[in-house]
Structure formats: structure tokens, C-alpha cells
Curated annotation (Swiss-Prot):
InterPro entries: ATPase_NBD, Heat_shock_70_CS, HSP70_C_sf, HSP70_peptide-bd_sf, Hsp_70_fam, ISC_FeS_clus_asmbl_HscA. Keywords: ATP-binding, Chaperone, Nucleotide-binding. Chaperone involved in the maturation of iron-sulfur cluster-containing proteins. Has a low intrinsic ATPase activity which is markedly stimulated by HscB. One of its GO terms (biological process) is iron-sulfur cluster assembly. This is Chaperone protein HscA homolog. SUPFAM superfamilies: Actin-like ATPase domain, Heat shock protein 70kD (HSP70), C-terminal subdomain, Heat shock protein 70kD (HSP70), peptide-binding domain. It holds the Pfam family HSP70.
Length: 620
């Protein structure tokens, strides 16, 4: 029996209008949409009862197919069926083509070097393909919820850089959908479990999806979600398990020179076998060739475990490094949350349990937990839970800084700093009369610019022509909740400023972040030595330039012998500064300082005489 809601005319029966917002897990393999309805958070099914939408888009002469329809045709038309498009987001065509994996697609490069898929519908980029995946999810949500969405929260891997995050936002913008927040996938899982289980303490989020692996160490305390550290691999996931099994099956069947269609069929069968091995000790695989021949083989769990063992060990090694970054041990981790369909693989669960010493949490479907967390966050951000005390603190994966003289990096925002964040630091001019300053924004953990990743360059003009070191330029780094960076430089006395929003033309390569972190640890001692040398060389150059200016102005205060002695010591410093002995340079600077103290005193006396010339003692 239907219940009637009674209210005064013109008034709502509810205390406030419920705003429609959803969380979307835009995954590499599958995507989902979830919402909070009547206090219950759940993923939304399509008209066929399917919750997950395969992240597959097929372009034909007649139109565009998305999801399961596209998946069914992928084996017959691999060239025009784009799968795992998330792996192409924010990457250059050169980066993609230089990778180990071959793709069946026809590519062309855009003006800025980004990949374009050549399809029967024309050229499309990864952002447009992603928008096609988002479209049915948004339509499903609006149909189910009965109205237009006022915002969405979309999840991204923690390792996505600025370009990849911006590309995700742009995909939603193509549909006219407002993005309330981009949310790291592991953090979304923490929200789902944090609100359900009221956990307090250190939690590990082990997220192994189709294309990426993320490990996040979080501290949950009284509604505050703080990410202590993140790690992982942006090019390791269940897809790699599939490709290894595909290669194994191909070798057993002694198949060579596969055409794209047969290769796709074999990959689909490998994925089916992988999923079946979750609950079975062995599975029969089969493949039908073009001539009707049916090939069969039995794949055992032991064989599959042996194939993927090295990759699973890589994820455990990432866990170990990230725990070290967070400053905690495995024993301090209260719970481990499993996220992503690939965590259903028995070997993965076994290895994770062995490393952390406890069975991982799987009470929420690992395929749906990210979407559920995103939906909870969307419900809060859209204003449906004004009483909520949930506070979310993400972190940036790599330090951000500015290039200084000598090719050194001055870190402004350190790695694993919680975001959103704003940090400011003051810099000054190097030369007398300097009226402009070039800024080079870099990303990385190394001490020298050459070993870090360049993000952007911009110039501040209109600096007052003062003596070296007299101007004060305040540089502010702001990282918003989506991980996008804005840098502003302002000269304090005039207020003149310049700024830039960092949107790199393409993202990091698959393993670059992990490599950068490993290199920073491997070369730490060497980098410190190189930094100390560069700092002394910069100081030597500054001292010599300053002294040359002083000699040009007041050199007549010196006797011929005094001038020759200073010139000789200066030449000695210049020669030593070209070497690689930081201590020797420092010592040479000190020697020059000793030899110029009398000159400095004479300059001071002369300045005082000039200042007081013609004045009586009564006027002083």
C-alpha cells in the first residue's frame, strides 16, 4: 500500500530538497556508478541488472557502441574496439609506441603529440573515449534517480598526474557534467570502510585493478582520513595477468603470427580462465581457429600462480616501501582493505595476508567499494549531509619545487604532503639591477634539476632594479583537492605578479614515478655531494660578481699592491670553483673574504665621508 506524504501547500514534505549526486568509478576494465538513496549506498544496475559497465568503446560506420555490446564485438573488430583507454590518458603517442605492449589500433599524433585513434567515426582522443564510457553511467543514474545530476565524484588512481586528472575532468565536461571532486581510488575505499566500520588506526588500502596498482597507508581517526603515504605502479594490474596467461597459452598451442582478431579471442579466453581459477584448481581452455580447429589445454592454479608470482611480489615490494615512507610497520596496520577485481586472485590474497599478518577485509565487494566510497563523498559534497564531520586528506606523490641558481632544486611542497595545500617561499635576485626572473617548476625527489621532471616555466617581469638580494619575490604553490597545481610569483614591494596553472601536455610514463623514487634513494649520498658542490659554486660566482662590481666602483681606494693581491686571490677562487671539491671552494671563499676585509672597511669609511660631506656636527 502506498503511503501519502502530507505537507503544507507550496512546501516540501522533506526538511530540505535532496540533491542528486553520484560517485563514478571510471575503471580500466570496468566502470560503475553508485548513489546514496534513503541512507543506503549502493551501485546502480542497468536495465539488465548489470552493475558494472565494461570500459570498452567500439566505433563503427553506423555509430558508437559502449560496454557489453562493444565487448562482444571486440574479438571480431579489435582495430576499432578501444579497451583500457585509461592507460592512454595523459600519455604521449611516443610514450605509447615505445612501450613493450603492441596495440591493434591505428594511431595518429595530435598537434601536441597526444594519441588520436583513427576510427570509422573519425579521429578520437582518449578524453573523448572516456566521455563515451561516462555517458551511459550518467544516463543510468539520472534515469534511476529520476532527475538531472547536480554533480559527480570521479575516482582516479593515486598515481595519476596533473594531465591525467585534467583529462578525466575534461571527459566529464564534454557531457556537461559538473565534477565535484576527483578522488583517489584507495581513499574512496577508505571512506566506504571507514563509515561502515568506524575504524580508527592505520589502514592499508591494497588496490589492484585492471591496469594500475596502488598501495595507500591511511590513518583513520575520529572522522579524519589522512593518507600517510602512497605507492604503487601505474602499469601493473589484472590486464598484465591476462597477457601473461595469454602468452603461456599461445606457447603451449605453438601459435605464431596471430592476427589481431585471433589475438583478441585468445586474450578473452585467458581472462575467462583467470577468473575461473579463483574457485577451481584447474580449468580447461579452448580456442577456435579460423579453419574451425578447436584447441584445448588444461591450465592449473599452480601454473597460473607461477606465471604471475613475480608481479605479485612487485606489489608486495611496493607495500614494503610505502610502509617505510609512512613511518609505520606491517604490525601497526590494523586492517588491509582489498580493492579491485584482481584482488580476487587467490595468490594475491595469500601474499597480502602473509605480508601484513592478517586476513584482508573483503566484506564490501572489491569491484564496488571504490564507487561506493565515491558516492558517499558525492552525497556530502553536494550538501546532503551538512552535519557530516568527514574530513578527507589526500597526498601528492612527488615533491614540487623551483629551480634555483646552479641547477639546484628548492622543494616547496614535499612528497606525501596532504592536499589541498598552499606553501609559500621567498626568493631574491642574483644580479644588481635585475628586473625579471624566470621560474622553472619541477617535480621529483632529486637534488638537481636535471634529475627531476620539468612541469612548467614562466617569467615574472617588472621587478624594481635593486641591488642583488634586495628584491623579495614570494612564490606560492597551491595544490587543490584534485591534485592540480597553480604557482604564483609576486614581487612584494610593487605587487606585480605572474602565475601559471600546471597542466602538462602529457603524463608520466608507466614506471617513471616508481623509478624516480628508487633513483632518489639510490643516489641520495651522491646527490647531496653534488648539491653541496653546486651551492659552493653558486656562492663563489655570487662573491666574485659582487666583488667585481665593488672594484669597478671603488677600486681607486686600493693601492696597486692591494689590488694585485685581491685580483690574484679572485683568480685563484675562480679556478678552484671550476673544480669539483666543495670544501676547497668554501676554503677559497673564506681566503678571499680575509683578503678583502680591509677593502670593505675602506668602502665603509668612504661612504660615511661622502654621506656627511658638507654637514656640521650640529646637523648630524
Amino acid at each position: 500500500m502506498a503511503l501519502l506524504q502530507i505537507a503544507e501547500p507550496g512546501q516540501s514534505a522533506a526538511p530540505h530538497q535532496h540533491r542528486l549526486a553520484v560517485g563514478i568509478d571510471l575503471g580500466t576494465t570496468n566502470s560503475l556508478v553508485a548513489a546514496v538513496r534513503s541512507g543506503v549506498t549502493a551501485t546502480l544496475p542497468d536495465e539488465n541488472g548489470q552493475h558494472s559497465l565494461p570500459s570498452i568503446v567500439r566505433y563503427t560506420q553506423d555509430g558508437i557502441e559502449v560496454g557489453q555490446v562493444a565487448a562482444l564485438s571486440s574479438a571480431q573488430d579489435p582495430k576499432n574496439t578501444i579497451v583500457s583507454v585509461k592507460r592512454f590518458m595523459g600519455r604521449s603517442l611516443t610514450d605509447i609506441q615505445s612501450g613493450e605492449q603492441a596495440f591493434p589500433y591505428q594511431f595518429e599524433a595530435s598537434e601536441n603529440g597526444l594519441p588520436l585513434f583513427v576510427t570509422p567515426q573519425g579521429q578520437v582522443n582518449p578524453v573523448q573515449v572516456s566521455a563515451e564510457i561516462l555517458r551511459p553511467l550518467v544516463e543510468r543514474a539520472e534515469k534511476t534517480l529520476g532527475g538531472e545530476l547536480q554533480g559527480v565524484v570521479i575516482t582516479v588512481p593515486a598515481y595519476f598526474d596533473d594531465a591525467q586528472r585534467q583529462g578525466t575532468k575534461d571527459a566529464a565536461s564534454l557531457l556537461g557534467v559538473k565534477v565535484l571532486r576527483l578522488l583517489n581510488e584507495p581513499t574512496a575505499a577508505a571512506i566506504a570502510y571507514g563509515l561502515d566500520s568506524k575504524q580508527e588506526g592505520v589502514i592499508a588500502i591494497y588496490d589492484l585493478g585492471g591496469g594500475t596498482f596502488d598501495i595507500s597507508i591511511l590513518r583513520l581517526n575520529r572522522g579524519v582520513f589522512e593518507v600517510l603515504a602512497t605507492g604503487g605502479d601505474s602499469a601493473l594490474g589484472g590486464d598484465d595477468f591476462d597477457h601473461l596467461l595469454q602468452a603461456h597459452m599461445q606457447q603451449v598451442w605453438q601459435l605464431t603470427n596471430l592476427d589481431p582478431q585471433l589475438s583478441r579471442q585468445l586474450l578473452i579466453e585467458a581472462r575467462r580462465v583467470k577468473e575461473a581459477l579463483t574457485d577451481a584448481s584447474d580449468v580447461e581452455a579452448s580456442l577456435t581457429l579460423a579453419d574451425g580447429t578447436v584447441l584445448k589445454q588444461v591450465v592449473t592454479k599452480a601454473e597460473f600462480d607461477n606465471l604471475i608470482s613475480a608481479l605479485v611480489k612487485k606489489t608486495i615490494a611496493s607495500c614494503r616501501r610505502t610502509l617505510r615512507d609512512a613511518g609505520v610497520t606491517a604490525d601497526e596496520v590494523l586492517e588491509t582493505v582489498m580493492v579491485g577485481g584482481s584482488t580476487r586472485v587467490p595468490l594475491v590474497r595469500e601474499q597480502v595476508e602473509a605480508f601484513f599478518g592478517k586476513a584482508p577485509l573483503t566484506s564490501i565487494d572489491p569491484d564496488r567499494v571504490v564507487a561506493i566510497g565515491a558516492a558517499i563523498q558525492a552525497d556530502i559534497l553536494v550538501g546532503n549531509k551538512p552535519e557530516s564531520e568527514l574530513l578527507l586528506l589526500d597526498v601528492i606523490p612527488l615533491s614540487l619545487g623551483i629551480e634555483t641558481m646552479g641547477g639546484l632544486v628548492e622543494k616547496v611542497v614535499s612528497r606525501n604532503t596532504t592536499i589541498p595545500v598552499a606553501r609559500a617561499q621567498e626568493f631574491t635576485t642574483f644580479k644588481d639591477g635585475q628586473t625579471a626572473m624566470a621560474f622553472h617548476v619541477v617535480q621529483g625527489e632529486r637534488e638537481l634539476v636535471d634529475d627531476c621532471r620539468s612541469l612548467a616555466r614562466f617569467t615574472l617581469k617588472g621587478i624594481p632594479p635593486l641591488a642583488a638580494g634586495a628584491a623579495h619575490i614570494r612564490v606560492t604553490f597551491q595544490v587543490d583537492a584534485d591534485g592540480l597545481l597553480s604557482v604564483t610569483a609576486m614581487e612584494k614591494s610593487t605587487g606585480v605578479q605572474s602565475s601559471i596553472q600546471v597542466k602538462p601536455s602529457f603524463g608520466l610514463s608507466d614506471t617513471e614515478i616508481a623509478t624516480m623514487l628508487k633513483d632518489s634513494m639510490k643516489h641520495a649520498k651522491e646527490d647531496i655531494s653534488r648539491r653541496m658542490l653546486a651551492e659552493q659554486q653558486v656562492e663563489a660566482a655570487r662573491v666574485l660578481e659582487s666583488l667585481n662590481a665593488a672594484l669597478a666602483k671603488d677600486g681607486d681606494l686600493l693601492t696597486s699592491d692591494e689590488r694585485q693581491q685581491i685580483d690574484a686571490v679572485m683568480a685563484q677562487l675562480a679556478e678552484i670553483a671550476r673544480g669539483d671539491d666543495a670544501d676547497a671552494i668554501k676554503q677559497a671563499i673564506e681566503v678571499l673574504d680575509e683578503h678583502t676585509q680591509d677593502f670593505a672597511a675602506k668602502r665603509m669609511d668612504n661612504s660615511i665621508r661622502v654621506a656627511f660631506k658638507g654637514q656640521s656636527i650640529d646637523n648630524i
